[in-house]
């Protein structure tokens, strides 16, 4: 009966997430979960709002605000696309535009970056002389969306889907994945997907005649302000403080053991405090009150709730995992474990282009655990594949959070970018199975 009660509150919650919103509905789920008796109130609060993903999102959102307000992101993007090598070479220009998005996006919130890049693309299109309806114009904007879905799962820094997935893997599988380990998988995946993007553009071959007379040197960025330089410097030190201990503890375990144990949030908190303490012209570099007012509270609440959602599903006391396994085994009978993984990845890829990415990820994560728990597959690597497949959402206006920024104003149409989009999605599925799974199996241990 305990499992029935959990399903009785989970299924309606999933429906509300898909049809209403993921904010107050997420809070409602916490209350209902306690009422089922599957978890105590203390366990629910600790596993949701007390989860490391919540504080991580809060702190990195504040850092992201500082980077945006001081112009660091804008100038980094402008530096890439103003290179001389791009003059008269439309494919090179598009490659630099996409590459700048991917590299910057590995360290900042992808939705905020999408907003910045949409504004940048509008300005670029005006200078180049292309308008809505032109293939080159559409290519700029669909590329922003492609980059966005890639970085949302390739890097754990300031990206909620990765933090949620890492949390579920640790809670349900007992596998601890550091930022450095995830990046060992995410960076090669992003590199392969950059090539996939360029392949999709090459197949598309958008008319770039208007670009040939455009002088990319006109985009040369202005120097950073003093606030911008301080923010950029402190952020780079923060990234080094997060990544170096994971590398250093292998070579010098005695020196880096402590720093690798404190986690990723402490350096970020120290960075926020430093930006609040350092003043320029009598004012702090970071306006903490203003930064807090921009926190994406609904997304933070949702992340915390999703982190605790898988716990009752895998608990022996509820029996849900065993029930799901018995229910689905006949459907997958005859398939090898890797065949099952591939089929689940395909299903997740299709579903995520119409429904919520995180809901898709959570759903197929739990289905996969029920089906593959007794197999010889690396379950941590399976989770990574599902996470990546559930993030490749670029086909429809409802595919992901930034999609309305691209489709809504008419920058692109579903039909206009369909061919290139399908090439991108097929290649992303191949990357999941050929790149992500073997790398994650080797790196996650």
Could you tell me what each predicted segment is?
Residues 91-92, 138, 180, 265, ...:
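Residues that define the loop-to-transmembrane-helix transition and helix capping
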Residues 25-26, 30-31, 35-132, 285, ...:
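Membrane-embedded alpha-helical segments and adjacent helix-loop junctions characteristic
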Residues 1-8, 89-96, 137-141, 230-234, ...:
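Short hydrophobic alpha-helical membrane-embedded segments
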Residues 63-72, 131-146, 151-165, 169-233, ...:
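Juxtamembrane and boundary regions of transmembrane helices in multi-pass small-molecule transporters
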Residues 1-56, 181-326, 423-429, 433-445:
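Hydrophobic transmembrane alpha-helices of multi-pass small-molecule transporters
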Residues 1-7, 50-62, 111-114, 190-191, ...:
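Structural signature of hydrophobic alpha-helical transmembrane segments
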Residues 13-22, 100-109, 146-156, 346-358, ...:
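Transmembrane alpha-helix interface/packing and boundary motifs in multi-pass membrane proteins
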